[in-house]
Amino acid sequence: MEPSEKKPIITVKNLTQRFGDNTVFEDVSFEVYKGEVLVIVGGSGCGKSTLLKIMIGLQKPYSGQILYQGMDITRASDEELNDYRQNIGVLFQSSALFSSMTIKENIALPLTEYTDLDPETINNIINMKLGMVNLAGYENHNPSELSGGMKKRAGIARAMALDPRVLFLDELSAGLDPITAVELDELIINTNEALGTTMVIVSHELESIYKIAHRVLMLDKEARGMIAEGKPLELKEHTTDPRVKSFFLRQLPAQHGEQRLYVN
């Protein structure tokens, strides 16, 4: 379900990130609309994960702004950043579950840190979130007892514990088998449609991108910035930029009149 009205919940303005003499990207500007699934794509080293970390507030940019409902998180105080992080959920590639804690204890962390809810209410929320990701009954398992896909779903349950307005996901399907990846795509779609959660996702999995994305932003390492924005199928069918075409068609430039498939 696409957002019914284009109201930006996050605005990125003229964002530049540099590490010493290395410019990762510069002058990147876009908006994240309320209720949409926005997928950030691009080749290795283009700055996808760096951009995500800046948007989360884990990294400071060289210059530029990221506005969340008018507050610039790049210049926010610790207290303001704390308030912002209560409105977002994050899942990195590794799922980042604490191995020494049960799944229940992992999901309880943000609830005990950011709320004054009583233990019974917290327990009810945990059970509800586990049910949402089809992990009911696994609350007392340790992460080591779960498959890769189950760990990702447990990570999503923890990221959703505080009912965030924005969910950030980094390479959700990386390293998973096709069936598990499809199940996670369905979970993303159902969560977005049922709760209206805005999502910002870094991905390179084409099948997943076509299925879940309302809109795509493409970064390019050589261009040091954003080179395309739009619906994934429209970019695939109508782009004239060879860099965008090579990504969405998974092709290398033809040599000697032959078309060559790109292998990830």
Language-model region placement:
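The feature captures the beta-strand-to-loop junction immediately N-terminal to the Walker
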Residues: V41-G43
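Helix-to-loop junction immediately C-terminal to a conserved catalytic motif
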Residues: I56
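Conserved ABC transporter NBD signature motif
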Residues: G64-D72
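Conserved ABC ATPase "signature" region
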Residues: M71-D72, P119-Y138
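Conserved ABC ATPase signature
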Residues: N142-L146, M150
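A short, proline-enriched helix->beta-strand linker immediately N-terminal to the Walker B motif
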Residues: A161-R165
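Catalytic Walker B motif of ABC-type/P-loop ATPase nucleotide-binding domains
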Residues: L167-D170
